């Protein structure tokens, strides 16, 4: 798999990037893949992931292209407003080790989403 480490443990996002797991991909380029989250708490729930396997901390130290694409996807899919968020660790309900950001929108989000 280009960009992902040798398989030590299973990484769903590495599998999606490699097209070995199904996903509703809405955008991709050389560095980033964007797909719809299978969970749907709000109308638009996109996951923006780097092709290269990195941790959340590594991703946020150098947001670069992932940040640019997250904002672009938010503006495209949620023109009335959106949130870009990440979960760090168990208490924040981070379920994937592969660094990623969520783009949430498509409705009034209220104080918390």
What residues fall within each predicted segment?
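HIT superfamily nucleotide-processing domains
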Residues: 1-113
């Amino acid at each position: 798999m280009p960009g992902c480490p040798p398989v030590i443990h299973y990484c769903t996002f590495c599998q999606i990037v490699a097209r070995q797991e199904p996903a509703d991909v809405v955008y991709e380029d050389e560095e980033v893949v964007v797909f719809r989250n299978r969970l749907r708490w709000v109308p638009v729930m996109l996951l923006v992931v780097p092709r290269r396997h990195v941790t959340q901390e590594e991703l946020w130290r150098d947001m670069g292209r992932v940040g640019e694409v997250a904002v672009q996807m938010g503006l495209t899919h949620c023109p009335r407003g959106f949130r870009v968020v990440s979960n760090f660790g168990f208490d924040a309900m981070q379920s994937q080790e592969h660094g990623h950001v969520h783009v949430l929108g498509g409705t009034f989000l209220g104080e918390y989403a």
